[in-house]
Amino acid sequence: MNIAVFASGTGTTLQALIDQQTTYGYKVTLLVANRECPAIERAKQANIPTLQSKDWTEIDNALTGHHIQLIVLAGYLAIIPEWICTKWEKRIINIHPSLLPKHGGKGMYGMHVHEAVWKAGEKETGCTVHYVSAEIDSGSIIAQSVVEVKESDTPNTIAQRVQAAEKVLLPRVIGEMV
């Protein structure tokens, strides 16, 4: 299965997907970034074609040209237009750093999520892989992984454990979709 990874940051989740593609039977065929970011260099080091663009027609054409079967949002900090969500329905997935529906929606990404979990005094958090729809973080849930929140935790320590769980859950889910 050919997948395109969309990323906006360091690309550590992209790297996990690259490292586990043989194990799970998918191929990272394209990286799409909406801005200059370290994920682009990671993709280039793995000989994966990259596209840095905010032009959704250009992005859609690249997806078609690379015979993409699944789009994986991995730290992609941009809203997907409704027409892309419709055209690629049930073929776009996202990894979110909480147990949705808790701590999801507009503005809930990265450390904002972990700070909200910590401030709420949650006993557990985790990550969710879900289908992408036009409404932020509201697509059908595919899988979740639970992470305990310890009394001694800070938002940073919560983030570290959730990110580690993401790097296990996301490749596995993609492998199950192959």
Language-model segment annotations:
Residues 1-178:
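One-carbon transfer enzymes
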